[in-house]
Each structure stands twice: as structure tokens, then as C-alpha cells.
């Protein structure tokens, strides 16, 4: 069993734990940007994370995504070589899908970091904070 939960709500805010990139078959989307994975594939991985985040957010909303008042913040960790500097472009894969799904309420504050490694060798891990109605 995990030593954490997928989300915690306090007041009107819900904090989603980090979600790692997974392929359509459920396997970990492993690799490092700047070595194994190009920016475009990293964006696809970040978009896949956004799909999973939305699923967790839906669970936090009792199944009703209309309760999402705003996506407040996204924090993205990109498994990167030391000389890779396009973490922000990779993270756009997540941010753009949130905008498509939630419209103006999907526009959010964001941080994108390059890190030396992510659990299970995943290429991207993203966490999210949302405000609920």
C-alpha cells in the first residue's frame, strides 16, 4: 500500500499528488529528455499525465468536473539531462490539455523543473492544485 493518498481536499482547494507519465497500455513512459526522448514526445507524455490528473480530479469532485472552479497551479518535474532546458515546452503538453478541457478556468500558475530522476524512470511527473465550487 502507498504511504500517501492521490488527493487531499482542504476547504475549497484540492491538492493532487504527483502523477507519472504512463503509456496507453499502462506501462511507465520511461526515459530522459535530452537523451532518450525529444520535446514532442515529452509533450505527449505530459498530455497523458494531464488525462490521469483529470481522472483523479474527477474522483475528488465526486464524479462532477463541473465543480472545478479553477486549475490553480501545476508543478511539473521533467527527467532531464543537465543541458536540457526545454522543460517548459514539455509541460505545455499538460497545460494545453487543461485549457482545452476547462477553458478559461484551466489557465493556471505553473512551475517546470528539470530533475535528475523520477520514480520508476518516468520521463515526467506532474502535480496539480485546483479550486472547487
Residue ranges and their predicted role:
Residues 1-133:
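Short, polar/acidic, helix-capping and beta-turn segments at strand->helix junctions
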Amino acid at each position: 500500500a502507498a504511504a500517501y493518498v492521490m488527493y487531499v481536499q482542504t476547504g475549497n482547494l484540492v491538492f493532487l499528488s504527483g502523477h507519472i507519465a504512463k503509456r496507453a497500455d499502462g506501462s511507465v513512459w520511461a526515459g530522459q529528455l535530452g537523451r532518450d526522448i525529444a520535446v514532442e514526445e515529452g509533450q505527449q507524455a505530459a498530455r497523458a499525465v494531464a488525462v490521469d490528473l483529470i481522472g483523479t480530479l474527477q474522483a475528488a469532485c465526486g464524479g462532477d468536473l463541473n465543480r472545478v472552479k479553477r486549475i490553480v497551479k501545476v508543478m511539473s518535474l521533467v527527467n532531464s539531462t543537465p543541458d536540457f532546458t526545454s522543460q517548459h515546452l514539455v509541460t505545455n503538453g499538460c497545460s494545453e490539455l487543461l485549457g482545452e478541457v476547462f477553458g478559461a478556468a484551466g489557465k493556471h500558475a505553473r512551475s517546470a523543473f528539470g530533475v535528475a530522476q523520477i520514480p520508476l524512470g518516468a520521463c515526467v511527473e506532474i502535480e496539480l492544485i485546483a479550486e472547487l465550487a
